[in-house]
Amino acid sequence: MKLLFIHQGFPGQFIHILRALHAQGCHQLVGLGIEPADQDLPASVQYFRYGLSRGNEPGLHPWVQDTETKVIRAEACAQAANQLKKQGFTPDLIYGHPGWGEMLFLSDVWPKVPVLTYQEYFYNPRGFDYDFDPELRSELDWGDCARIRMKTPNQLLTLEASNWCVTPTQFQRSTFPERWRGRISVIHDGIDTEKASPAKHPQAVTLADGTVLKPGEKIVTFVNRTLEPYRGCHTMIRAIPHLQQLEPDAKLLIVGKTTGVSYGSVCPEGEWKDVFLAEIEGQYDPSRVHFTGQIPHDQFIPILQLSRAHVYLTYPFVLSWSLLEAMSCGCAVVGSATAPVQEVIHDHQNGLLVDFFSPQAVAEAITQLLRDRKLAKKLGTAARSTVLQHYRLANCVQRQLALMDLVASGSIGA
């Protein structure tokens, strides 16, 4: 088949699919994106970059600026696609990520070509992330709801222009309007369960600050891409004094960027990490809390292999790969009892679930795992089994390829 992949940060989530298609050796693989490829591409992939010809117009109503940005990107992507068309390229299937607008007009370039879109999340003013945390978000008024609603025109237009869609989890599918859910398949990107696996003989790890983590120590891990409330950094930091009272020998590793945000609002006073640490100043031993910053993935897995308890907290939002990687490594997990986590973790079966807003509950659950090695082993083994059964990379890729065949052939979405 002739396949066109679209992602502003190519290849993004499509890298494993591209590798599998390359291995089959019978496809023409073309990619379009703005940024340089962020990973080594298979040799058969032709990747073309395009630029933006204009920026946002000054003076626009702030609620439509996001839509204008996406239209600018969509126009640029469609122009690049049209150049490919003029050169004689017509794909059998277009598969792309619509999050930045690029997918809006591709069905106008090739009206008869099926379009499959990777849908991550639909913005809703109520019932999901925006109104979840009353401490950090006052009650939404009509203007807040209107501003959030104006994030959705690109999503709605892309849904209309797509023959079929795919999203990684049932929770993410549930964020979309009900009338569209019947055309959204649930297939996860997949976890490399060979790389993310328990170590038979875990090795000591030396952190950048010189701290040595040794097998058998009471190591607790907590991971955010960026330390922010969306991923429970405030609850975790507030749990530190409780944890150290219960388990003074525990070593807590907090992994992730400490400046800015990936999701949600920026901190109004400095950085979120510093604001919440100031709350517990004088109540904990900082020598046993290690902020590692971002670390390379090949250093991240050995840390998970040493972890005696892994904490994952999130608003009702997109599920992080880091949770599934921790589970794949056999970590005993303390997770928030929020919908995306509850889809993966069942309390006392393959992890422990706690109230997102309760630092004490988090500390007590960690302590339970540190003290009850038999329970921790049982939960960690079950956690890995969950990932092997539902999220193994090879299986997920094969399901993606099968879906692509169905959409390309017109068997679904026609």
Annotated model-derived regions:
Residues 259-260, 265-294:
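Nucleotide-activated donor-binding/catalytic signature segment of Leloir-type glycosyltransferases, i.e.
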Residues 208-231, 237-242, 252-255:
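Conserved donor-binding/catalytic core segment of Leloir-type glycosyltransferases
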Residues 1-46, 412:
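N-terminal subdomain of nucleotide-sugar transferases
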Residues 315:
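Aromatic "clamp/platform" in nucleotide-sugar-dependent glycosyltransferases that forms part
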Residues 54-64, 113-153, 194-203, 257-270:
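Acceptor-binding helix/loop patch of EC 2.4 sugar-transfer enzymes
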Residues 332-335:
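Short hydrophobic beta-strand element within catalytic cores of glycosyltransferases
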Residues 347-348, 352-359, 368-374:
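Conserved acidic donor-binding segment of nucleotide-sugar-dependent glycosyltransferases
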Residues 361, 368, 375-390, 396-402:
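A short, well-ordered alpha-helix in the C-terminal region of glycosyltransferases
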